[in-house]
Each structure stands twice: as structure tokens, then as C-alpha cells.
């Protein structure tokens, strides 16, 4: 004969309620960490990285909140190319590249378009295509058809390089010459950087999550093969350590009151009158 069914001890019910409360507290903490205050100020660093070489093309730090710290970023096209665009000898007049002043100058006058890799669109290909396998994948750039997008996170446009490009007598000069190599050339710049680019965040870029880096491909628009550059944009968020309060020096133990200095007494000998 089976014994009667007994209810669970009351302590089991208490444990169940304790577990529910604990889970609720953890969930609340998790929500709090995942959704920080929009007014919290952080030390925020934006980095543009050459995905082929791993070198940084730009690193800009600023203080701000997660909703307003979206600065304009400046970098040079050759910083995301490196030596990957140095054409072979089979292409004697390529009109692009970063290894010679004239190629940098010609490249400066060439249109380009940019395609996002974070969108994961199959028809646009992968890194080997610069995420621009077919027309229509481009979302920004500097071309005659002015590519644009309502959903991508950035725009990339050409900047303006100060300085002259042609000296008297027809000789070429200016910022496309590296001053470390051509110190006597008028207007030569550090590294011969004369292909400045300006990256700005769109409204969608200000609203998206930047928990990890996002990648793009840039291609020159030219006759023949359009060379590819790959870069990423990432954000690092660091909390600001509050300054420690400065107070009076701590009182040392066994301190005695300062001793009073006793002035020596002088014996005055009266003079006879």
C-alpha cells in the first residue's frame, strides 16, 4: 500500500522564492550595465585601422557620452593602403599608388567609392571584393554619381590639402613629396600625405551599437581594375576615474604639543651714575 503523498517541505518553497529573487536582482543588474545612463561621461577613443597591415590610420580620443561623442575623423588614403597598391612594372602609368610622389598626386585626383562589410550582403562579396562585388553596393564616396545611403553608418569624402602643386618653371612640388626625402621641395609634407579623407558618422551610425569594429572597403574608380583598400572603425570606451579627495594630513600618534621656546635672560649690570 502506497503511503500518502506529502507536500514539499516549506524550506523548498523558501529556496524557490530566494532563487527567483536572486535571478531578478541579477537581471536588473545586467540591464543596468547594458543600458548605462545616457548622461554618463566616458573617455572615448575612435580608431581607424588598416585591415591589411593592422596599423592605425587614426586614433582620436575625447570626453563625452555614448550618444554625443561622434567626432569627425581625418586620415590619409595612403594610411589604409600601405604598399598594397604599388603597381607592378607591367603597368607603367597606373595613376595610383603611394610609393612615389607623382602616383600620390595622380591618385589624389581619382574618384573612389566605399562599400560596407558589416551589412553582410552576399551579392556584394567579401574582403577580396572590397565588399563591392556589384554596382549598388557602394554607400558613400567621391564619384560623379555621388553614392549615398539611408542606412549606412559613415560617409567618406575627400579633404583639402593646403599648399601648391606646381612651382615656377613647371616643376612639381607640394605635399605629395615626403619632406624627409625631399627636404628642399617647396611645400613637402610629412610622409608625402596629400590624399586626405574625412569620415563622418551618419544618424544611423550614431544610433547603432559599436560593441565591436565594423569594416568597409574602398575602391578607386578608374579604367581597368579598381584597387581595393580595407579599413575598420572601432570605438573604445573607458570609464573616468574620479579624482581622489584631498584632505588634511592624518594625525600622527603620540604627538606632543610644540614646546615653547624660552628666550635667554640677560643680566643687566647697572652703570654707576
UniProtKB/Swiss-Prot annotation:
Disulfide bonding pattern of the chain: 115-132, 124-137
PTM remark: Specific enzymatic cleavages in vivo yield mature proteins. Envelope glycoproteins are synthesized as an inactive precursor that is N-glycosylated and processed likely by host cell furin or by a furin-like protease in the Golgi to yield the mature SU and TM proteins.
One cellular component (GO) term of this entry: host cell plasma membrane
Stretch list, region Disordered: 242-273
Entry-linked Pfam families: TLV_coat
Coiled-coil positions: none
Keywords: Disulfide bond, Fusion of virus membrane with host cell membrane, Fusion of virus membrane with host membrane, Glycoprotein, Host cell membrane, Host membrane, Host-virus interaction, Membrane, Signal, Viral attachment to host cell, Viral envelope protein, Viral penetration into host cytoplasm, Virion, Virus entry into host cell
Known glycosylation sites: 43, 58
Membrane topology, Extracellular segments: 35-273
Signal sequence range: 1-34
GO biological process: fusion of virus membrane with host plasma membrane; symbiont entry into host cell; virion attachment to host cell
Purpose of the protein: The surface protein (SU) attaches the virus to the host cell by binding to its receptor. This interaction triggers the refolding of the transmembrane protein (TM) and is thought to activate its fusogenic potential by unmasking its fusion peptide. Fusion occurs at the host cell plasma membrane.
Subunit structure: The mature envelope protein (Env) consists of a trimer of SU-TM heterodimers attached by noncovalent interactions or by a labile interchain disulfide bond.
Identification of the protein by name: Envelope glycoprotein
Gene of this entry: env
Amino acid at each position: 500500500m502506497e503511503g500518502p503523498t506529502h507536500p514539499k517541505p516549506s524550506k523548498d518553497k523558501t529556496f524557490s522564492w530566494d532563487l527567483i529573487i536572486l535571478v531578478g536582482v541579477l537581471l536588473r543588474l545586467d540591464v543596468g550595465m547594458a543600458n548605462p545612463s545616457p548622461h554618463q561621461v566616458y573617455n572615448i577613443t575612435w580608431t581607424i585601422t588598416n585591415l591589411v597591415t593592422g596599423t592605425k590610420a587614426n586614433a582620436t580620443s575625447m570626453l563625452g557620452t555614448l550618444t554625443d561623442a561622434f567626432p569627425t575623423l581625418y586620415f590619409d588614403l595612403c594610411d589604409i593602403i600601405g604598399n598594397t597598391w604599388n603597381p607592378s612594372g607591367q603597368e607603367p602609368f597606373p595613376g595610383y599608388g603611394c610609393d612615389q610622389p607623382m602616383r600620390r598626386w595622380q591618385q589624389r585626383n581619382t574618384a573612389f567609392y566605399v562599400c560596407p562589410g558589416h551589412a553582410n550582403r552576399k551579392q556584394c562579396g567579401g574582403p577580396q571584393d572590397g565588399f563591392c562585388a556589384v554596382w549598388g553596393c557602394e554607400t558613400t564616396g567621391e564619384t560623379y554619381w555621388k553614392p549615398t545611403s539611408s542606412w549606412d553608418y559613415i560617409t567618406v569624402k575627400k579633404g583639402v590639402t593646403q599648399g601648391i602643386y606646381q612651382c615656377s618653371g613647371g616643376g612639381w612640388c607640394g605635399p605629395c613629396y615626403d619632406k624627409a626625402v625631399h627636404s628642399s621641395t617647396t611645400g613637402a609634407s610629412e610622409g608625402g600625405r596629400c590624399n586626405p579623407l574625412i569620415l563622418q558618422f551618419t544618424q544611423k551610425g550614431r544610433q547603432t551599437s559599436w560593441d565591436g569594429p565594423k569594416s568597409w572597403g574602398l575602391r578607386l574608380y578608374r579604367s581597368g581594375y579598381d584597387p581595393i583598400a580595407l579599413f575598420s572603425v572601432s570605438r573604445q570606451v573607458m570609464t573616468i576615474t574620479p579624482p581622489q579627495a584631498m584632505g588634511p594630513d592624518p594625525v600622527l600618534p603620540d604627538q606632543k604639543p610644540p614646546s615653547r621656546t624660552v628666550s635667554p635672560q640677560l643680566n643687566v649690570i647697572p652703570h654707576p651714575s
